[in-house]
């Protein structure tokens, strides 16, 4: 007890003695009161000691707890912390441990926060992939017993894997969205409605939510894109079919190009493939309806136009046949066409296709006949010149000095040269015709007559004419010989001299019947031999420039 406290207690005791003296308190009472004071002081001391003892125990417990917590934190954090434990009082020991504990607690809070954020992100991405709604309260709880850096690294690696998967899925979703958008423009349907049918988070009105990347969303997208591509393919095939129908009908009815240009967008699709990039709206239902309406309109005009085209093609076929001297019964063919069209038994397209086939065959046959027909034309021309020369040589005034006489003389000279080539022409024609008939197994008809038979007939007729000419020349020779003998025997009689070049026996000349000539007949003939009889005609003495054959 300090001196000041002792002095205070003594003075108080002295004051108490004085009071007791004044009161007249007995010594027994005084002793009793003093004992009570001592007891009360002792109780107070005891209380103080007990309180101090408890405080010491509390400090010891705090120190032990701090040390235990440090050990637990080091285990949870996976870190080892070295610190020097002081040998001093409990308070000094606690003050040395407290900073270490606080540092570890800060690390724990930081690590727990990092783990919690990582786990929440993992839970969020996992929920997105699973297609579940995510809230922060549904995140995973942090395991307080494992707050190590290794655990954090593992979770972060898992998070990165999930982020990569999310990025891949998001890329797929964006790719699907682009595909749906492209198809929506081609097919002209509501893009937002299509996306909303997959998931509401995909529309532009759901900007507050991330796009769904769940398996269900990807599966729905796959089915949607597949169905849209199938629809695109179906519409493309339909429009291509309508386009081909329009092309056929336009060509059939010779529709002007101005009318066709309205449907260039359909015609441009004829060579397109299902995977090709197409123009916006080119496969819309409105485009298909317009094409269907046009095909219906063209089909309604087709019947009347087809009749006109059928007869036009028939005329073309007949013209080809006539121009190439091929056999065709025009009247019977037209009558048959009229009956077939009016009865309705035959499809006009089939009829037209049949006629087109006949035209193609006729053109092919005409091409194969061209060389022969060209030679037939030359042969006919020679025959015509032969006929003209016959008529010319019968004209007694052909040598008169009239206008154009010199032209006729030149023509006659050329005609004799051309006529001399007729036998060779007939030989070549016969060879060509036989080769043609052997190759095709059918007779070569020219104006409905077998050309080979016509050529053979011409050979016979020409031989007959040559024989008649020979007999005529022999008769003339005998007549001339008889006249010479008479003149030698009886002398010449004065007679009026006939004009130069005039035949002495004009009235006795045997003429070839024109009716037996074939220059104007449908057929043509070839003679394999024989000379031209023109050289045996009576020629005036002064016509020395003209060709003569004996």
Curated annotation (Swiss-Prot):
- What's this protein's family per the entry? Belongs to the MAP65/ASE1 family.
Sorted alphabetically, which keywords does the UniProt record give? Answer: Cell cycle, Cell division, Cell junction, Coiled coil, Cytoplasm, Cytoskeleton, Microtubule, Mitosis, Nucleus
Instruction: Give the subcellular location.
Output: Nucleus; Cytoplasm; Cytoplasm, Cytoskeleton, Spindle; Cytoplasm, Cytoskeleton, Phragmoplast
| Residue ranges the record marks as coiled coil | 46-174, 288-310
The site (Microtubule binding) lies at: 401, 412
Instruction: Describe the subunit structure.
Output: Forms a dimer. Binds to MT, mostly with coaligned MT, both between parallel or antiparallel, forming thick bundles. Bundles polymerized MT via the formation of 25-nm crossbridges with cortical MT.
Give the residue ranges for region: Disordered: 471-531
What role is this protein assigned?
Microtubule-associated protein that bundle and stabilize adjacent microtubules (MT) of the cell cortex. Confers MT resistance to the drug oryzalin. Promotes the formation of a planar network of antiparallel microtubules.
Identify this protein by name.
65-kDa microtubule-associated protein 5
MF terms from GO for this chain are:
microtubule binding
Gene Ontology cellular component list: cell cortex; microtubule; nucleus; phragmoplast; plasmodesma; spindle
State if Ribosomal protein is listed as a keyword: no
Q: Name one Pfam family in it.
A: MAP65_ASE1
Superkingdom of origin: Eukaryota
Which portions of the chain have biased composition (kind: Polar residues)? Answer: 502-511
What switches on expression, per the entry, is described as: Expressed throughout the cell cycle.
GO annotation, biological process:
cell division; microtubule cytoskeleton organization
**InterPro entries per the UniProt record, alphabetical:** MAP65_Ase1_PRC1 (IPR007145)
């Amino acid at each position: 007890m300090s001196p000041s406290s002792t002095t205070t207690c003594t003075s108080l005791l002295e004051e108490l003695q004085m009071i007791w003296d004044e009161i007249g308190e007995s010594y027994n009472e005084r002793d009793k009161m003093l004992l009570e004071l001592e007891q009360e002081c002792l109780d107070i001391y005891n209380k103080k000691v007990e309180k101090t003892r408890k405080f010491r125990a509390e400090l010891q417990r705090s120190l032990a707890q701090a040390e235990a917590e440090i050990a637990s934190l080091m285990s949870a954090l996976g870190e080892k912390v070295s610190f020097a434990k002081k040998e001093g009082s409990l308070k000094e020991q606690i003050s040395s441990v407290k900073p270490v504990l606080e540092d570890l607690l800060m690390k724990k809070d930081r690590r727990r926060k990092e783990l919690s954020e990582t786990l929440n992100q993992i839970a969020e991405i996992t929920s997105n992939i699973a297609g579940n709604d995510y809230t922060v309260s549904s995140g995973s709880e942090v395991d307080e017993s494992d707050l190590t850096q290794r655990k954090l690294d593992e979770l972060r690696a898992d998070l990165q894997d999930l982020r990569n998967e999310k990025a891949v899925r998001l890329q797929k979703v964006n790719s699907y969205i682009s595909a749906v958008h492209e198809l929506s423009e081609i097919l002209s349907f509501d893009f937002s409605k299509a996306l909303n049918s997959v998931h509401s988070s995909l529309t532009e009105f759901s900007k507050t939510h991330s796009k769904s990347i769940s398996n269900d969303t990807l599966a729905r997208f796959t089915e949607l894109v597949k169905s849209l591509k199938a629809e695109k393919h179906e519409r493309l095939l339909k429009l291509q079919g309508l386009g081909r129908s329009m092309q056929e009908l336009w060509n059939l009815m010779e529709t002007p190009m101005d009318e066709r240009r309205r449907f260039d967008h359909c015609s441009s699709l004829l060579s397109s493939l299902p995977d090709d990039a197409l123009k916006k709206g080119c496969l819309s239902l409105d485009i298909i309806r317009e094409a269907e309406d046009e095909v219906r309109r063209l089909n309604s005009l087709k019947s009347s136009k087809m009749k006109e085209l059928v007869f036009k093609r028939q005329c073309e076929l007949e013209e080809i046949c006539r121009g190439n001297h091929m056999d065709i019964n025009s009247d019977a063919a037209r009558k048959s066409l009229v009956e077939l069209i009016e009865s309705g038994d035959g499809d006009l397209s089939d009829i037209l296709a049949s006629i087109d086939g006949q035209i193609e065959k006729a053109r092919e046959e005409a091409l194969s006949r061209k060389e022969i027909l060209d030679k037939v034309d030359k042969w006919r021309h020679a025959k015509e010149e032969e006929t003209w020369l016959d008529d010319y040589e019968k004209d007694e005034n052909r040598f008169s000095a009239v206008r154009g006489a010199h032209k006729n003389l030149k023509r006659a000279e050329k005609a004799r040269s051309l006529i001399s080539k007729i036998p060779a022409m007939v030989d070549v024609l016969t060879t060509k015709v036989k080769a043609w008939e052997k190759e095709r197994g059918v007779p070569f008809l020219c104006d409905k007559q077998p050309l080979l038979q016509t050529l053979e007939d011409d050979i016979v007729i020409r031989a007959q004419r040559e024989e008649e000419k020979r007999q005529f020349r022999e008769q003339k020779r005998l007549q001339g010989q008889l006249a010479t003998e008479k003149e030698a025997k009886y002398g010449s009689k004065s007679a009026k001299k006939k004009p130069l070049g005039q035949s002495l026996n004009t009235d006795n000349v045997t003429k070839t019947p024109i009716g037996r000539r074939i220059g104007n007949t449908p057929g043509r003939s070839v003679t394999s031999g024989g000379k031209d009889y023109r050289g045996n005609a009576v020629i005036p003495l002064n016509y020395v420039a003209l060709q003569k054959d004996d």
